[in-house]
Amino acid sequence: MAESTTLARPYAKAAFELARDAGQLSEWSALLALTAAVAGDSNMHKVLNHPALTSAQKGQTFLDVCEGKLNEAGANFVRVLAENNRLVLLPEIAALFEQLKAQQEATIEVTIESAFEMNDEQENKLAQALQKKLSRNVNLRSQLNKELIGGIVVRAGDLVIDASVRGRLAKLAEAVNS
């Protein structure tokens, strides 16, 4: 994982700089999401790892699957990745691109796990509180997790706030056992 991130980072940065300079961050985001989905497909994974195919053949097969949904710059990006045998890194490249885009737009992806379904008012209040705390715009995504028993777990980048009953019970059990 760490190695693939290291290999993917320069490609993600290059794609980001190209997209930013062209004013096409959203277009490139969609383009990379598409190519990441194609690269993540199990059949395409077999093609990309097939030893008998040349990198040019792998790249052309990949472009054929995308069926003209890529602009010229996107197709060239795929060709460069194919030449360097890096098409399998597209999911990682797309994820790193999204991180760079979020930094540029001063936004952060926040995942909220809650034991019970949250209504819109609760989500809005939580989003406002997180925006104030993090000094960034927040894209909130909520998930239901009955295992929490009660409360919520907030994940924003490397920040984790565990305000769940399960988390409190785990801390209590740890304190009792030590």
Swiss-Prot record:
Subcellular location(s) per record: Cell inner membrane
Membrane topology annotation: Peripheral membrane protein
Swiss-Prot/TrEMBL keywords: ATP synthesis, Cell inner membrane, Cell membrane, CF(1), Hydrogen ion transport, Ion transport, Membrane, Transport
Segments forming a coiled coil: none
Single GO term (MF): proton-transporting ATP synthase activity, rotational mechanism
GO CC terms: plasma membrane; proton-transporting ATP synthase complex
Keyword Transport: yes
Pfam family, one: OSCP
NCBIfam families associated with the record: ATP_synt_delta (TIGR01145), PRK05758.2-2 (NF004402)
Family under the similarity heading: Belongs to the ATPase delta chain family.
Subunit structure as annotated in this protein's UniProt entry: F-type ATPases have 2 components, F(1) - the catalytic core - and F(0) - the membrane proton channel. F(1) has five subunits: alpha(3), beta(3), gamma(1), delta(1), epsilon(1). F(0) has three main subunits: a(1), b(2) and c(10-14). The alpha and beta chains form an alternating ring which encloses part of the gamma chain. F(1) is attached to F(0) by a central stalk formed by the gamma and epsilon chains, while a peripheral stalk is formed by the delta and b chains.
UniProt function note: F(1)F(0) ATP synthase produces ATP from ADP in the presence of a proton or sodium gradient. F-type ATPases consist of two structural domains, F(1) containing the extramembraneous catalytic core and F(0) containing the membrane proton channel, linked together by a central stalk and a peripheral stalk. During catalysis, ATP synthesis in the catalytic domain of F(1) is coupled via a rotary mechanism of the central stalk subunits to proton translocation. This protein is part of the stalk that links CF(0) to CF(1). It either transmits conformational changes from CF(0) to CF(1) or is implicated in proton conduction.
Protein name per the record: ATP synthase subunit delta
Source species of the chain: Hahella chejuensis (strain KCTC 2396)
